[in-house]
Amino acid sequence: MHHYVIIDAFASAPLEGNPVTVFFDADDLSATQMQRIAREMNLSETTFVLKPRNCGDALIRIFTPVNELPFAGHPLLGTAIALGAHTDNHRLFLETQMGTIAFELERQNGSVVAASMDQPIPTWTALGRDVELLKALGISDSTFPIEIYHNGPRHVFVGLPSIAALSALHPDHRALSSFHDMAINCFAGAGRRWRSRMFSPAYGVVEDAATGSAAGPLAIHLARHGQIEFGQQIEILQGVEIGRPSLMFARAEGRADQLTRVEVSGNGVTFGRGTIVL
């Protein structure tokens, strides 16, 4: 038998945010079994906690219903919050395929209510398929250069002129499915408050409630293009249009040619617990 918890990540109340199933003590499971379990759970991601291979507190493997991911934001934040219930430590180091990710845990009345992570520093380049992407999104232009960031997942960013325009998006998901191995992040806002929507048929996600791995790159994107200062924390609200409001905080420190830290944080709550017989 294997025990699991479901954490609603980037949420302050159950049934908000982005859910992740976290399986503990998964060392006896094969990669094939993990993939089949993730398909059975049918959430956007499921994580498996294994004994560390290096100097971390645990090794984490992340699966969507269709493939394994080297890194993902909301699954790792949810996993850190789940593991925090089993330790008094205020810091956790979780090993992933993209390296060891450091977490700071925030507690209230003894319970972990939030976590912050140091994300991998991404690389970026122009997408080069702007016209095709804009047509798939049903819009004529982007308010920012369309660029793709890579920090494990690959995230494309498209700017919208207003929150209303962002909410009105109705993408052609069949056309978006031709953008292989990438997620399309559309955003709007100003100052420190931004809204986002993420579409990724290529990753098996029609629309994501909270894309933590895109939050850090969005902060970089905004700073690189003069909308915020490097080191300034922003709020990113996502999932509103699908009834799963999710609040993320992100900050990129350094400068465009020498980033020193990418931090993403948010709350999380336990939604449920269970056991599988396997």
Swiss-Prot record:
It comes from the Bacteria. It catalyses: (5S,6S)-6-amino-5-hydroxycyclohexa-1,3-diene-1-carboxyate = (1R,6S)-6-amino-5-oxocyclohex-2-ene-1-carboxylate. InterPro entries: Phenazine_PhzF-like (IPR003719). Pathway: Antibiotic biosynthesis; phenazine biosynthesis. GO terms for cellular component: cytoplasm. It is an enzyme of class 5 (isomerase). It holds the Pfam family PhzC-PhzF. The active site is at E45. Transmembrane segments: none annotated. Keywords: Antibiotic biosynthesis, Isomerase, Virulence. One of its GO terms (biological process) is phenazine biosynthetic process. The keyword Metal-binding does not apply. GO terms for molecular function: trans-2,3-dihydro-3-hydroxy-anthranilate isomerase activity. Its EC number is 5.3.3.17. Belongs to the PhzF family. PANTHER family: ANTISENSE-ENHANCING SEQUENCE 1 (PTHR13774:SF32), PHENAZINE BIOSYNTHESIS PROTEIN (PTHR13774). Isomerase that catalyzes the condensation of two molecules of trans-2,3-dihydro-3-hydroxyanthranilic acid (DHHA) into the phenazine ring system. The final product is not yet known. This is Trans-2,3-dihydro-3-hydroxyanthranilate isomerase. It comes from Pseudomonas chlororaphis (Pseudomonas aureofaciens).
